[in-house]
Amino acid sequence: EISACLVGSEMCIRDSGNLVAIITMFFIFAMISFVTNLAAPFGTIWRNEYAGSNTLGMMGNMMNFLAYLFMGIPAGNMLVKIGYKKTALIAMAVGFLGLFTQYLSSLFGAGAEVFAFGEYVIKLNFVIYLLGAFICGFCVCMLNTVVNPMLNLLGGGGNKGNQLIQTGGALNSLSGTLTPLFVGALIGTVTSSTAMSDVAPLLFVAMGVFVAAFIIISFVAIPEPHLQKGGVKKEKFSHSPWSFRHTLLGVIGIFIYVGIEIGIPGTLNFYLADSSDKGAGIMMNGAAIGGAIAAIYWLLMLVGRTASSAISGKVSSRAQLIAVSATAIIFVLIAIFTPKDVTVSMPGYTVGEGFMMAQVPVSALFLVLCGLCTSVMWGGIFNLAVEGLGKYTAQASGIFMMMVVGGGVLPLIQQSISDSVGYMASYWLIIAALAYLLFYGLVGCKNVNKDIPVE
């Protein structure tokens, strides 16, 4: 029997049918990663279309995450007004629309010039693609808002709730592993003729998955404990999450963390797919190899989350955050200072040859290893930032969801740097970001506002 109890309430849900709801939430967790991780490998196509501009190549990722800034708090309000199930159904419909819009970019607008962006002339098909990525961002924001509190509720909160979230996170990482692998395999080598139509089969599969998910969720009974009853007045608090220093610094930490998580593999993918002198020097199947190696990063995030869930009962979130931040700094420094001609064999994948070993710079290996470190950062920052918030926790959750926009902003800045001074030099931005997380774990996470009543 699976039970879930509301914190601060005598209401308790006990229903073996919750197993179906849990499996459904796991499925949604995987979908979040699938949609999010389409942006970076798709970016290799647009990057090539615009003369190797890494900044424009990362714009799809930026639009995907920009949606969080607009949808973070409204998505939380939707849970209260219409419940988990309807919010999830709306998210699935929006996700289908976003993917379909991206597919339309392969059919229309390739010859229609819209406006100039520096030295580049932006075509209508790129604008359509960015619109689709933005719409998909609304989808994943709503799904994120549903899945985390729902799994915590179904697990009864506490360690069991966290265990379900960690399991969902593992499936999220598995999905993130497969997505760049599939896209890279479909693209192969990026050439002047490579277009969105080459990845249309994956978009069709994704749209089909959203339709199937919509149908499944329609028939699944999901508990709605937070659904607001008519006539309930919204409680007004004397303070806000911003009143707590450790929460404010944690909000900044979430913004930075998501940028790190996306920026490391995203830039690495571009680096390996770039056959010019700026790139890694891989002349054949660069996009496929880059996608496969980026997939290893997400696979290591799966390993890291699994390991973290096993030790979290004995090792504090603070200790984990300090350890992984320091380790990641070392890995990235090694990657920056190791010459490109120092290589190592790593597994790749192409449609024609299947799995194979590819020679890549050693830098790629150390950047991939960062996946072990980034895997536990979200949970660590979140737990430390909401510690001692009490009744302000729900408000803080909405703010954290908005700060996921960092996954679009920081990688875009990193690509701008890479356009100017090179791929490896752009990782100094990642070093600075990791240094902030190390500071947060050492000093910034301490609650210095315990005088504020939270009950």
Predicted feature descriptions by range:
Residues 20-52, 144-148, 264-272:
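Extracytoplasmic
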Residues 39-40, 243-295:
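Extracytoplasmic gate region of multi-pass secondary transporters
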Residues 93-121, 327-356:
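C-terminal ends and interior cores of transmembrane alpha-helices
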Residues 142-156, 375-390:
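Intracellular juxtamembrane helix-capping segments at the cytosolic ends
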Residues 161-221:
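Helix-loop-helix hairpin linking two adjacent transmembrane segments in secondary transporters
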